[in-house]
Amino acid sequence: MNDSDETAFRSTRIPADQVRARMLRAAREVISAHGLTVGFAHLPMEEYIRLAAVPRSSVYRIWSTREEFVADLIGEIFVADRFADGADPDAQRAMTEVYERSSAHLGTAVGRRQVAWEMIRIGANSSVETLRASVDWSSYNALLACTFSMEEGPAREAVRATARRLETMLSQRLRDYYQDVLDQFSASLRPGFTTLQLAHLTAIVTDGLVHRGRLLDDELDAVVTAPGLDGEPVEWSLTAWTIRSIVDGMLEPVAEDEPPADR
């Protein structure tokens, strides 16, 4: 923006709330296409000023430093973005479809457990594919990586507060989803385990394997062959099999000879 542009903007007197909204909108549009990177070095205020078509002087009256702008922007991104809505809706939809087409197996605890394993197999695969292609997920992980690497100050505290809020929200939503599934299957966890622990563990497994799969895809894309819903061998991704193993270890076992449940 040159001096004549700045003079023209002064004459229009854009209100501060509009300047703020335009700047954040311009930045969000860029980030929605390209994502965040660790360190936030790719967030150029001058470029956003140009895209937003607002006076530079007005921008720096709102945010005296780039760090203040970044902190404000981070909060805005992760309040409004789709990714902040919780667990992967595609995975949950796929798992629901497995449940709905498996009514013949739901009459016994053993059958319900088999359906649960199939839901994990299909749902975990869906989550992996979604995360691999998700700009939002990459941005979220960049946010987490920066929470301890930024210099001390208000900007770092604001970023950490956003990361903590998001991590808590996502974990609690996944916890609630797991509790709903346990209730649906008339299942319970062994004493000492909680659905919040389960939410943390499954998220860590999925995130970790997807991250490492970007470097070691030939190894981490390997599949495990094991019985599926009907007892026939099917392919399990490492993510799905690991999550199944975690869930199996945390669930109360079922009796093989339990009579059919009333329906």
Residue map of PLM features:
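C-terminal peripheral helix-coil segments that are non-catalytic and often amphipathic
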Residues: 1-3, 172-187, 196-263
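Hydrophobic alpha-helical connector segments
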Residues: 83-137, 199
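Solvent-exposed, amphipathic alpha-helical segments
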Residues: 26-34, 105, 201-212
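Amphipathic alpha-helical packing segments from all-alpha helical-bundle domains
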Residues: 113-130, 134-186
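Short, amphipathic alpha-helix enriched in basic
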Residues: 17-46, 50-54, 67, 74-77
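Basic, amphipathic alpha-helix used for nucleic-acid engagement in HTH/winged-helix/SANT-Myb modules
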Residues: 1-18
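Residues in the recognition helix of alpha-helical DNA-binding motifs
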Residues: 62-63, 72
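Residues in the helix-turn-helix
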Residues: 58
